Amino acid sequence: PEKAGWSVEKIAEGWDVLMRGLGYDRFFAQGGDWGAMVTSAIGAQNKGGCAAIHVNMAVATPPPEVLASPTPFEAQSLMRAGWYQEKDSGYSKIQSTRPQTLGYALTDSPVGQMCWIIEKFHGWSDCDGHPENVFTRDHLLDNVMLYWLNATAASSARLYWHSFAAGNLAEVQVPTGISAFPKELFRPSRRWAETRYK
């Protein structure tokens, strides 16, 4: 967006307005990655139009009982989340603190923009170390070009800046389905997810 201020919550409000403007009084929402955060915000805001949501990257704070006595699945999920925070979230730190600086660099360099995005496909997909095992080269380049041709490196990074500043993991009251795929960054158990998704 050209204007600043588009946090997860504002995007969720925009989706609700869009759906109603298109004539949908009731709808379902689904999302993964940032889409999961937006979809969760749609469910939390619960303006009456969203009947249910589905996310495939549920973000919820682990409750004390999970931290005190995790199941094997929960222990693995906690370990992966810890690894992510310590070893794999550097991109998130710079995007949430210096989005414009990063934006200028990526907008000025098509190779830099490509590396910034393809590295995420490498690390976050179930690709056995090579993104082209699961994505075509055209798919990868299409994704990169969405950012490059529109010069949206800075505005997309600002999503982190605006959303992390809010720090909101509001409770979701609408019916929710969650998929926890093997290579997902965050994979809460049911009791863990139920701390946020009611």
Residue positions per predicted region:
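Active-site loop/oxyanion-hole signature of alpha/beta-hydrolase fold enzymes
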Residues: 1-34
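Short aromatic-enriched loop/helix-cap "lid" or pocket-rim segments at secondary-structure transitions
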Residues: 2, 64-69, 189-191
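Short helix-capping and inter-helix turn/linker motifs at the boundaries of alpha-helical repeat units
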Residues: 6, 91-93, 135
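Beta-sheet entry/capping signal
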Residues: 16-17, 25-28, 49-54, 104, ...
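Active-site phosphate/pyrophosphate- and oxyanion-stabilizing loops and adjacent acidic/basic residues
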Residues: 16-17, 40, 191
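Conserved hydrolase catalytic core segment
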Residues: 22-78
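The feature captures the conserved acid-bearing segment of alpha/beta-hydrolase catalytic domains
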Residues: 68-99, 169-171
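C-terminal subdomain of alpha/beta-hydrolase-fold enzymes, centered on the catalytic histidine
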Residues: 95-198
